[in-house]
Amino acid sequence: MATKRPSADQPSTRPLLDKLGVKPGSKVAIVNLDDPGFIRLLRERTADIITGKPRSKVDLVFLGANTFSQLRKLDDMKKWIEPNGGIWVVRPKGGRSELRDTDLIAAGLTAGLVDNKIASFSDTHGAMRFVYRLRDRPK
């Protein structure tokens, strides 16, 4: 018998870090994201966490964004990630931000990235992941 998949209306029960693709030993950069609870969770999974611009490539970047000017950092940040890495843009849900999903998608495309996943980051914030297209990944 096939297992029943949860409906889109039901929240995921997977742990947040699993949803975000943070694996043990992942290299992570955090920019403009003041969330002590999230950082505590990250430290339980990986010790390789940088605040700000990393000196070497990272697997994941978590960018807190509330404004268009913060989204413009995507073009520079794409140089920070491994070819198969990702940048999560975390922003307030609902009308608490000037940014809409379409704004994030457009900023990603302008930076040469595509969105490929969304996640509920918290009760108040959502996140959208951006990655290189397969054909555009640096060798």
Regions found by a protein language model. Name each.
Residues 61-71:
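Short, glycine-rich nucleotide/cofactor-binding loops
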Residues 113-139:
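Class I S-adenosyl-L-methionine
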Residues 70-103:
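Mid-chain, well-packed structural core segment of small domains
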Residues 20, 25-34:
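Conserved class I S-adenosyl-L-methionine
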Residues 1-19:
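Class I SAM-dependent methyltransferase Rossmann-like catalytic core
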Residues 48-58:
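Short acidic low-complexity segments
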Residues 100-119:
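Conserved Class I S-adenosyl-L-methionine
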Residues 35-41, 96-99:
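Short, charged/polar "capping" segments at the starts of alpha-helices
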